[in-house]
Amino acid sequence: MHVTGDRTAEHGLSTVGYDDEGVAGQSWDLIRDGVLAGYQLDRRMALLKGFGRSNGCAFSDGPGHMPLQRMANVSLQPAADGPSTADLIAGVEDGIYILGDKSWSIDMQRYNFQFTGQRFFRIRNGRLDGQLRDVAYQATTTDFWGSMEAVGGPQTYVLGGAFNCGKGQPGQVAPVSHGCPAALMRGVRILNTAEEGAS
């Protein structure tokens, strides 16, 4: 598993030449080979925690707000020689192929979460077998990433994003991108949101 923070990504919503403390945009590893390797840092946090320098993560959404430490474009990187999406699907006997994201709910510790996608397809015997609706997936962060069995190659990578990532008191809103290749997860809890809403 390889996850990067990147303030330089082409077309990234959190891409900057310089952050709001004057630190140049840069790219760094957050997770390398499945092990925590780096952090998002502004000048204050770098000083408090003994790091040599900020990696350019200070952002203010306007002149009336102090800069906060904010997320860079955070992306799960593809495997250099990873499989195609079709090859990943071919290895699934019974599952769901989820494209994009639509809504999300996550607790303050960023541990328990529920997400929905934009499109859903049933997988049966290694093939797509019709569309689904009213699908959500639910997990804890550690269980979810621990369920990852395979990551697709560069041809499966997509950079998406959100314009309204909110943080702080008083609240500030920042745009941010997240990139991801196709990935195969096993044993993730799936919900029928139509049934859940009716109960």
What is each residue range found by the language model?
Residues 1-199:
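N-terminal small-residue-enriched
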